[in-house]
A protein has these predicted regions:
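Conserved, mostly hydrophobic/aromatic
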Residues: 42, 72, 110, 168, ...
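C-terminal beta-sandwich/jelly-roll accessory domains of carbohydrate-active enzymes
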Residues: 379-446
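Catalytic cores of secreted or luminal carbohydrate-active enzymes
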Residues: 299-351
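Aromatic-lined carbohydrate-binding/catalytic grooves of carbohydrate-active enzymes
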Residues: 33-167, 183, 193
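Carbohydrate-binding surface patches
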Residues: 353-396
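Flexible loop/turn segments at secondary-structure boundaries
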Residues: 9-12, 48-51, 79-85, 124-129, ...
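Short Pro-Gly-centered flexible turn/kink motifs
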Residues: 1-10, 435-442
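Active-site neighborhood of glycoside hydrolase catalytic domains
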Residues: 100-102, 134-136, 140-297, 309, ...
Length: 446
């Protein structure tokens, strides 16, 4: 019988979400990273895709260090013959043509810069153009003598078989042991089809999918026990496997491969109904966005990404001097407020992106002394009506100082929650444009 997770709330959907957040954050997540703020990272995927070598990676990492980033993550393309997505999966040994000093040499150079090093893997998958497949063609999920569906040019390894799990465990453990790795992003970029195991009898084929996920859990268990300090992030073409079972092993999940800030408002708003902020992978990416070709302000991209694990997925060397200074300020802001946002605060949804043009949410400390709120306007409008942003979760009798942009006001909690504060509108369409956002910091006054 499948397990069910249920909570009770007498404070509406925000109360329900906070109960889930505390349950998962305090009781489901394990180890070193339970109730621990996340490092600010830079991932090279949208900066380079498969086209990189050691020099290019080190140049990106050097710039990341300059702006205050703490963790550099090397994504897909570092192993086997992985120069595109047609080949290489299953061969978990370094591509020496790209990285002549190996992952061990690269990770040491990254650490010498003062950064931690992270690595992307997709351990459950295999390409037919790989040494792994050529040696073990029967390790694929799929019936013999029938067509084996591929997706992204890849196939699923049969993790219902212990020898497959053992092989992958030995392969990736060797890479980790030889290197200095602080973070692993574990991806899964296709669904399972034709669920037939060539290692099981006809009578046991109905157990294949269940035994497969038990094999995934087994590999996670062995890796997390052997390498307890590594921060694991799960991923499945984004958030396709965002569930409590995975959070037990990996305390954060890449929420979506869609990194567009406007889309992320809906994605992160919806995810927040059940999953805590600290579990939601969120990055500032380049513009035009690589998924939608939409351009959003750098400030808005950060203002959305703050409410997650926070990081960057772009080549900082391509930014202007002004943008670099803005990124430095963003990193400083997140370092100052990440304990509140990710670990110590309660999350409140205020305005739904599914119900109008505006989105708003906030995080309030348990003692109600501090809060950070985000407001996002999707499309600019001519002669838009006046509106007030009404905060939630504050102490009605407490005097607060609210800061945003170059403005500041003082008001009691009941005023801020029931009357709210006016939202600045750009009535002449001269400055804000589409996808404008405002970040508010709220602090109790003595």
């Amino acid at each position: 019988t499948p397990e069910v997770v249920m909570v009770y709330s007498d404070k509406g959907l925000n109360g329900m979400s906070q109960a889930y957040h505390r349950l998962y954050r305090d009781r489901l997540m394990r180890g070193k990273w339970r109730n621990h703020a996340r490092p600010i990272l830079l991932n090279n995927w949208e900066a380079t895709y498969f086209d990189f070598d050691e020099e290019k990676i080190l140049n990106i990492a050097k710039k990341a260090k300059e702006v205050g980033v703490e963790l550099f993550v090397l994504d897909d393309g570092w192993f086997g013959t992985r120069n595109d997505d047609y080949q290489g999966l299953g061969d978990w040994f370094v591509n020496k043509n790209k990285l002549p000093n190996g992952i061990s040499g690269l990770s040491r150079k990254i650490e010498e810069m003062g950064l931690k090093f992270g690595l992307w893997v997709e351990l459950e998958m295999v390409n037919k153009n790989s040494d792994c497949y050529r040696a073990h063609p029967d390790w694929l999920i799929g019936a013999p003598d029938r067509f084996e569906s591929h997706s992204r040019h890849q196939h699923v390894l049969d993790f219902s078989r212990s020898e497959v799990v053992d092989f992958i465990y030995d392969s990736i453990s060797k890479v980790i042991e030889e290197s200095s790795i602080s973070y692993i992003k574990w991806d899964m970029n296709r669904y399972m089809s034709e669920p037939f195991s060539r290692g099981a009898s006809a009578a046991d084929q109905g157990k294949t999918m269940h035994k497969y996920i038990l094999g995934v859990y087994e590999l996670y268990t062995r890796l997390t026990e052997r390498f307890p300090d590594i921060l694991f992030e799960s991923c499945a073409s984004g958030g396709a496997r965002f569930d409590p079972g995975m959070l037990y092993f990996a305390p954060q999940t890449w929420t979506s491969d869609d990194t567009d800030a406007a889309e992320r408002e809906k994605i992160q708003y919806g995810t927040s109904f059940v999953y805590p902020i600290v579990s939601m992978g969120s990055h500032v990416s380049a513009v035009p966005n690589h998924q939608l070709h939409r351009t959003t302000p750098l400030s808005t991209r950060a203002n959305v990404a703050y409410f997650g694990t926070f990081g960057y997925e772009l080549d900082l060397n391509l930014l202007s001097a002004k943008e670099i200074e803005e990124v430095k300020a963003q990193v400083e802001f997140m370092k100052e407020h990440r304990d509140l946002i990710q670990v110590e605060g309660d999350f409140y949804r205020i305005l739904s992106p599914f119900e109008g043009n505006d989105t708003a949410w906030m995080v309030v400390s348990r003692d109600k002394k501090q809060a950070v709120a985000g407001y996002y306007e999707r499309l600019n409008k001519v002669n838009a009506s006046w509106m007030r942003l009404r905060f939630k979760g504050l102490d009605e009798d407490q005097l607060y100082k609210v800061k945003w942009e170059d403005k500041c006001l003082k008001a009691y909690g009941n005023e801020l929650m029931y009357a709210g504060i006016p939202v600045d509108r750009d009535y002449c369409n001269k400055t804000n444009g589409d996808f404008h956002s405002v970040l508010y910091t709220i602090e109790a006054e003595d």
